[in-house]
């Protein structure tokens, strides 16, 4: 159970997300032709959208932010599509299938970061930034050092997330489609590069919107059929599930997932603040026209995601009833065919037959593509906009910047494919957990304090940001997941699986201490600039001109 939790805990939406940690033993399934045909339809349709988008991408603004022409509703759907993962869909329903009520608590953990984004970040981020969150962090601070730190934080998060996505994609497709792992990884990598290379943010947005609609439809249909089976009574749903589950009434008892309060708190903080520091999520707020639309984006996204995670709870209990109690879905040893992560897929077959099973399998693949496209664009923009155009070659033309961005997309895609193949048999669950810890410990403190704390200086942001990033990496390496399970040592030096509680504390303390003790003239000037930044963040004055910081 501990390994299941570790794998799933590392698959935060994180969104974001894709088969973030379909890890452990994978049994290749027979080739599923219905799923392959439906997925090919999705690919052809989205490539058509990419061609359409490529005709409309004429400038840097079009490429990075779809020209700021996405509506709040569309962006909310796209954010949900970027955040709701195959791990969310398969992993949480599998967690409910095995642990019951605890799965609901865990699924709600995916949402706790969104009120922070809604009330503290979305409006000011949109008013101050243009293409990346580094625009905001460096608004009144030194451009070079802050952009380098922000870009490094973004690239580390993107790289870890992308590797986990690619490995998860290969294993998931092997499970659902019966395709060879290497073919699956190459296919995801090539499609990802095509979406981003030719269609930029516009194509990525519509891939994410389509994926969100398909996933919400599929999950809604499954939940509807489950509730129909029990007469639309939650009481009947829980009673029937308790009657057939090996744990009986214990599946309705909370508290079995995390072994101690420190781990629970650290996991919660990582989920909450990590979400608010994910570069591919933050980038989406620059695709709308103003702060009002940015707020609407979060409102709609939170609604869609909250609805989705409630559905996964119903799907998990439905799987207990209709899959767990049906020997047709068990192997000779009495285990679920393909492993517990297949619970939702088997339920799709139980409630909708082979055709719907093919649909859900294709949606799971589409989910991965939507996430990796967003990640790739975020990584490319960090290199081309933050590093190339604002640090290494100031004054670069739009054409030069876009060329660097597209070269970066190709490099990221090739690296992702190679590492996806190399990590095939490795435990990659820790990578997404580490990505969230870094986002929470490096990106989030700098974004938050740059917008809200007038005494922040470049010195404080640099020292605190780097300390948070390094602490998260070191503690993760010394913890049980890497030190014991991967490196094979007998006992972990750092006893907790989740470093966020400690690394976030180090980051905030470092930023406070080194800013408070900064008596330089540069520090004083940066403090004075806060008032002008505050007015811009509240009013959005000047944002219409798309000022480049």
From Swiss-Prot:
Record-linked CDD domains: SLC5sbd_u4
Membrane topology recorded in Swiss-Prot or TrEMBL: Multi-pass membrane protein
GO biological process terms on file: plasma membrane acetate transport; sodium ion transport
Cellular component annotations (GO), alphabetically ordered: plasma membrane
UniProt record similarity statement: Belongs to the sodium:solute symporter (SSF) (TC 2.A.21) family.
Function: Transports acetate.
Protein name per its UniProtKB record: Cation/acetate symporter ActP
